[in-house]
């Protein structure tokens, strides 16, 4: 009888043992979607992704989003459904498998695009991950990154010149690298691009609008420097509908 009671006790203990006695593999897939555009992937250097335990700060996984920007017609359609899957097999993502013992609050931080650090942005979010649940299928965990890429191509930094009038050339694009142009989902008239001229001491001189060159994402304008000295030129881009913006800076010295 004692033996039977002990056996019954063992059975009950087994039945009452917590389900998560051992850590459970929990697949996670993270994609970063540029505001009003496509996924940020290999063509822009990817996004740095870090997953941390929110309570302890301990890193759990890190890496970069790799892959393509995705299917334009699928992502940019105005009629997509509530649960539409935007990712294709090639769409950029970072994948990891976390071993979770219990429901865990994590902080997911993304930074980039890594190939355009002058325009990079950082976004972080917290969420509860449950052991054994699949966070990798469909759209996975999708994070939206605001901003615009601005890259001043001319004048190069620290240019010394005798010419009072110089040409400004800038590349302006979405954070995924998607081009601005008349034959793209990102028409030129949607954006305001201008150059702001400052003296080296910080005094604002004036702003000059940049005009679309006819080549995808390239904007240009001449600007006149009135007196000798060092100047800063900050080229900015703004989307008044989404409120996305970006900037890049260069310097010029008029002899």
Residue ranges, per PLM feature:
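Surface-exposed, short loops/turns at beta-strand junctions within beta-sandwich domains
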Residues: 100-102, 224-229
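Short acidic/polar inter-strand loop motif in beta-rich domains
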Residues: 101-103, 110-121, 238-247
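Short, compositionally biased P/S/T/A/G/V-rich stretches that sit at domain boundaries
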Residues: 129-178
């Amino acid at each position: 009888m004692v033996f039977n009671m002990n056996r019954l006790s063992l059975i009950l203990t087994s039945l009452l043992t917590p389900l998560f006695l051992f850590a459970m593999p929990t697949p996670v897939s993270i994609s970063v979607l540029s505001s009003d555009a496509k996924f940020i992937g290999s063509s822009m250097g990817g996004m740095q992704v870090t997953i941390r335990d929110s309570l302890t700060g301990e890193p759990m996984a890190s890496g970069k989003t790799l892959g393509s920007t995705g299917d334009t017609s699928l992502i940019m359609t105005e009629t997509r459904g509530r649960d539409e899957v935007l990712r294709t097999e090639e769409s950029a993502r970072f994948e990891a498998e976390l071993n979770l013992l219990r429901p865990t609050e994590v902080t997911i931080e993304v930074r980039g695009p890594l190939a355009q650090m002058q325009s990079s942005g950082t976004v972080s979010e917290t969420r509860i991950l449950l052991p054994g649940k699949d966070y990798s299928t469909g759209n996975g965990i999708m994070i939206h990154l605001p901003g615009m890429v601005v890259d001043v191509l001319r004048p190069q930094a620290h240019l010394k010149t005798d010419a009072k009038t110089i040409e400004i050339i800038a590349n302006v694009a979405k954070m995924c690298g998607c081009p601005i142009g008349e034959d793209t989902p990102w028409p030129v008239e949607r954006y305001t691009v201008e150059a702001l001229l400052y003296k080296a001491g910080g005094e604002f001189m004036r702003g000059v609008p940049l005009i679309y060159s006819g080549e995808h994402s390239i904007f240009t304008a001449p600007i006149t420097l009135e007196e000798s000295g060092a100047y800063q030129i900050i080229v900015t881009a703004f989307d008044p509908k989404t409120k996305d913006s970006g900037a890049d800076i260069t310097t010029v010295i008029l002899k």
